[in-house]
């Protein structure tokens, strides 16, 4: 299992924030391969998320775990840095840079220099990768003094697109839209998004018509003051057209994915507009496509990866076809006011959408809406399948790991025997039983062998309740006297019918997927006989994996070696092992009072 550190603005309301969350979701989907750590960072002036969700709870657990680990001597196998390349560092033996690239024709030479710190680079679009890879700069050889004016980064690039979020359920946002035909735009109001022209050209085209434009905008943060700034800017644009018939609506503030979905599915919102100067990917455009909404956009930059789809011609040849309304454009130098030293350079160009073409496309979409809607439905179906979360999470996880990752089919996991000694466990037995039966593969793959070592407690009453519920999964035996814990374990080994064994103490608690992941690790590693895990350290008894007082405090056991085993019993925390080991090495040594599992 690789220790992997993600440094990203994953708690911010930003494109890079969503990119960071995508990386973490992909790693979580393949959690059996990774020990995940995460450091949240700021992203400009954007706000931070405050949603109280299960995912946010998981983020907080990972952050706490990272803080505790970093107070020791952290040693990560891989770092993943989701940010602009200027901030990339060597943080681990393997370093992966994840960036949206730059939405112009060249990257800064600093990016080429920083790329050399990375072992591989991930971008969300082919456009972003091509611009980065094809930019040349001048370098001087330290050995010969020779200058190479055509130096390009030699670091390998991987394109991993954002996934379609099929699990998002719509939550209605109440909009009072006066007209039945409305366009939608979603953006942070900055120079690159070209909002001033979009609004102005829309009003000029539909000044005397019953058409609306919904603008989901923020300038920096989704706060009340920011709303005032956005409202003033929009009001200033519209002041030139006091007698217009068309409507322009400002929608401001943070909307959850579920609420954003309701915009794309609103019966009165018909198409998505963008006059962007360039996109690394274009998430709002992508969301529109995923929900069968016709798109009007310039024919340049990252969003083209999902606005074209392969189609067969009458002659049977397959070619990529534009499934949206294309705006004509020219490439022009970026304005001086947007130049950003080390990031957005003066020698670069970006897309200038043509006013006339934009107006024509809006007119065409409104007039011939059924044709554009038909194309949008075809494209949406294709993108939902091609960009599914399962596919994209696998692509991302494999790129980050640097190797193929194959999940184990649960049907291939052999039977697991859980061996437990019961003694003086009244305070723990109910919570213990609930913890075990809630394992993801308990009913299908597990048998729980409970041996009561003549305990003076009343554990049997609780155990019998669970035997009634799970008669095929629980084996119970009561002894007349206590022979010692390792004698009990050896009895359980003899009784076990599973190919894999694990011990579970009454005061232990497990992640609900613990046995599934341990068994999968054994199945995936035929040369290994035992797997073990790290442990959270809690302050209170009977806490659960999802709600406990560990605050990230944990034991991080080292990789197995005989030298390390002399120092600490690394596999002590509920290991899982092959039953066949007992045929080769015998059973637990009953002479030891507390170290039989170490010996």
Model region roles, listed by residue range:
Residues 5, 45-131:
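Extended catalytic core of nucleotide-activated donor transferases of GT-like folds
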Residues 349, 555-576:
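A recurrent flexible, glycine/aromatic-enriched loop bordering the glycosyltransferase active site
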Residues 452-461, 481, 505:
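A conserved acidic beta->alpha catalytic loop
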Residues 501:
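Short aromatic/hydrophobic "clamp" motif used to bind/position activated sugar donors
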Residues 513-546:
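Conserved donor NDP-sugar-binding/catalytic core segment of glycosyltransferases
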Residues 593-599:
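Acidic donor-binding loop at a coil-to-helix junction in glycosyltransferase catalytic cores
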């Amino acid at each position: 299992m690789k220790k992997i550190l993600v440094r990203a603005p994953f708690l911010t309301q930003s494109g890079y924030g969503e990119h960071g969350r995508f990386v973490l979701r992909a790693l979580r989907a393949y959690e059996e391969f990774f020990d995940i750590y995460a450091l949240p960072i700021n992203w400009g002036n954007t706000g931070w998320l405050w949603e109280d969700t299960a995912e946010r709870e998981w983020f907080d657990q990972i952050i706490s775990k990272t803080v505790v680990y970093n107070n020791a001597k952290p040693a990560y196998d891989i770092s993943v840095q989701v940010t602009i390349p200027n901030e990339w560092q060597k943080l681990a033996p393997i370093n992966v840079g994840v960036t949206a690239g730059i939405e112009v024709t060249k990257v800064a030479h600093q990016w080429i220099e920083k790329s050399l710190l990375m072992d591989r680079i991930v971008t969300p679009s082919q456009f972003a990768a091509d611009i980065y890879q094809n930019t040349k700069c001048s370098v001087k050889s330290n050995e010969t003094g020779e200058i190479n004016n055509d130096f390009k980064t030699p670091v390998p690039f991987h394109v991993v697109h954002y996934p379609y979020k099929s699990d998002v359920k719509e939550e209605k946002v109440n909009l009072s839209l006066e007209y039945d035909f409305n366009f939608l735009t979603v953006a942070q109001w900055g120079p690159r998004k070209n909002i001033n022209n979009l609004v102005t050209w829309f009003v000029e085209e539909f000044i005397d018509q019953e058409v609306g434009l919904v603008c989901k905008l923020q300038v920096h943060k989704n706060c009340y003051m920011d709303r005032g700034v956005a409202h003033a800017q929009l009001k200033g644009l519209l002041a030139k057209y006091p007698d217009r018939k068309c409507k322009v609506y400002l929608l401001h503030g943070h909307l959850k994915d579920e609420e954003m979905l309701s915009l794309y599915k609103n019966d009165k919102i018909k198409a998505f507009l963008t006059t962007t100067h360039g996109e690394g990917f274009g998430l709002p455009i992508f969301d529109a496509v995923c929900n069968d909404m016709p798109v009007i956009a310039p024919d340049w930059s990252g969003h083209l990866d999902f606005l074209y789809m392969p189609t067969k011609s009458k002659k049977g040849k397959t070619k990529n076809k534009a499934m949206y309304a294309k705006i004509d454009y020219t490439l022009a130098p970026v304005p001086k006011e947007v130049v950003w030293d080390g990031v957005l350079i003066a020698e670069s160009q970006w897309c200038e959408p043509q006013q006339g073409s934009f107006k024509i496309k809006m007119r065409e979409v409104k007039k011939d809406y059924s044709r554009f809607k038909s194309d949008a439905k075809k494209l949406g179906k294709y993108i939902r399948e091609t960009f599914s979360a399962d596919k994209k999470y696998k692509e991302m996880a494999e790129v980050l790991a640097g190797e193929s990752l194959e999940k184990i089919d649960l049907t291939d996991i052999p039977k697991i025997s859980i061996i437990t000694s019961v003694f003086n466990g009244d305070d723990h037995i109910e919570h213990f039983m609930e913890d075990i039966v809630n394992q993801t593969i308990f009913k299908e793959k597990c048998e729980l062998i409970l041996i009561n070592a003549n305990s003076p407690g009343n554990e049997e009453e609780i155990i019998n309740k669970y035997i009634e519920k799970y008669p095929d999964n629980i084996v119970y035996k009561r002894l007349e006297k206590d022979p010692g814990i390792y004698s009990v374990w050896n009895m359980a080994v003899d009784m076990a019918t599973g190919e894999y064994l694990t011990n579970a103490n009454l005061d232990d608690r497990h992640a609900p997927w613990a046995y599934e992941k341990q068994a999968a690790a054994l199945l995936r590693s035929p040369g290994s006989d035992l797997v073990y895990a790290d442990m959270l350290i809690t302050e209170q008894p009977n806490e659960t994996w999802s709600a406990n007082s560990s605050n990230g405090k944990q034991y991080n056991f080292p990789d197995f070696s005989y030298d390390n085993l002399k120092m600490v019993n690394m596999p002590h925390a509920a290991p899982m092992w092959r039953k066949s080991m007992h045929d080769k090495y015998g059973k637990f040594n009953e002479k030891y009072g507390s170290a039989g599992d170490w010996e």
